Regions:
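Intrinsically disordered, low-complexity Ser/Thr/Pro/Gly-rich regulatory segments
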Residues: 1-237
Length: 237
C-alpha cells in the first residue's frame, strides 16, 4: 500500500471521495500526470485535453484530499512523496469496483513467491466461484510492448484462472496495436487460433476466456460487458 496514495488520505471519508473521483477518466489522467510531473508540474504542461478551469477544479479536489499543496505561480508540492506513479492506486480502484459493483472478493497487488512467471498479479477476484485475473495498464498503448503482453499470458498460463482481463486505462483504440500484440502472444503460446475477436466496440476476447478492453464509455460498463460475455458464454454456449 505504500506505493499508493491511500496512506496519505487522512480519513475514511477522503478514501470514499477519492473512489468517487477516480470514476472520472479526466481526473485519473490529471492524477497520473501530476504524479509523473511532480515539481515540474505547470497547468499548461497537461496539454489540450484539459481546460484551465478543469485543471484548477481538479487541483483543488486533490489539495482537499491532502495529496498536494498548491503554491504561487501555479506550481504544486506533492505530499505523497513515496508514490511515483498511478499504477498501484489504479489497481486498488479496480479491485474496489469489483467489490462494490459486482460483489466480488478481490485482492490487488498480489505477489505469489516462487513462480516462474514472476508471480505479480495486479488484481485477483472471485466472482460466482470463478477466479478472475485482471491486469491493469495505465500507460497509453504506444508505451505497451510485446514483452508485457507475453508476460501477462505467462502469468495466465501459470495461474490458470477461469478467465482473465487486460484493462487499459485509455480512450484510445485497442484494435490498432494491442489486439495484434495479444494475438501474437497467444500464437507464440501455441494457440493456432489465437486471433482476438471483437465483442463490442473496443472490447475483444479470445475464446471468451481472455479479454482486452479500455476505459472508453467507462470502466464499469466495459467490465460488465466482459463479465456478461464470459458467464453467458459459459452457461448458454
Amino acid at each position: 500500500m505504500d506505493r499508493t496514495v491511500l496512506p496519505y488520505l487522512s480519513s475514511p471519508a477522503n478514501r470514499e471521495t477519492l473512489y468517487g473521483l477516480l470514476h472520472s477518466y479526466a481526473f485519473r489522467l490529471f492524477l497520473r500526470d501530476i504524479l509523473a510531473l511532480r515539481d515540474r508540474y505547470q497547468p499548461e504542461r497537461l496539454g489540450p485535453f484539459f481546460s484551465p478551469e478543469s485543471v484548477d477544479g481538479m487541483a483543488r479536489q486533490v489539495e482537499r484530499l491532502g495529496l498536494i499543496r498548491r503554491k504561487a505561480g501555479g506550481t504544486i508540492r506533492f505530499l505523497a512523496e513515496a508514490v511515483t506513479d498511478f499504477g498501484e492506486t489504479f489497481e486498488w480502484f479496480v479491485a474496489e469496483i469489483l467489490r462494490r459493483q459486482f460483489a466480488a472478493d478481490a485482492l490487488w497487488g498480489v505477489t505469489i513467491p516462487g513462480l516462474p512467471c514472476g508471480g505479480d498479479f495486479d488484481v485477483l477476484a472471485l466472482l460466482s466461484g470463478k477466479l478472475l485475473y485482471l491486469e491493469t495498464k495505465t500507460s497509453p498503448p504506444k508505451h505497451i510492448e510485446q514483452k508485457e503482453m507475453s508476460a501477462f499470458l505467462a502469468r495466465v498460463k501459470t495461474l490458470s484462472p477461469d478467465f482473465a482481463i487486460v484493462l487499459v486505462d485509455t480512450h484510445l483504440r485497442m484494435k490498432d496495436k494491442l489486439v495484434p500484440l495479444l494475438s501474437e502472444g497467444l500464437r507464440a503460446e501455441g494457440m493456432s487460433d489465437g486471433e482476438m475477436t471483437r465483442v463490442e466496440k473496443e472490447t475483444f476476447s479470445w475464446e471468451r476466456r481472455i479479454y482486452l478492453t479500455n476505459a472508453k464509455r467507462d470502466i464499469v460498463s466495459n467490465l460488465t460487458l466482459c463479465l456478461r460475455t464470459y458467464f453467458v458464454g459459459r452457461f448458454f454456449g
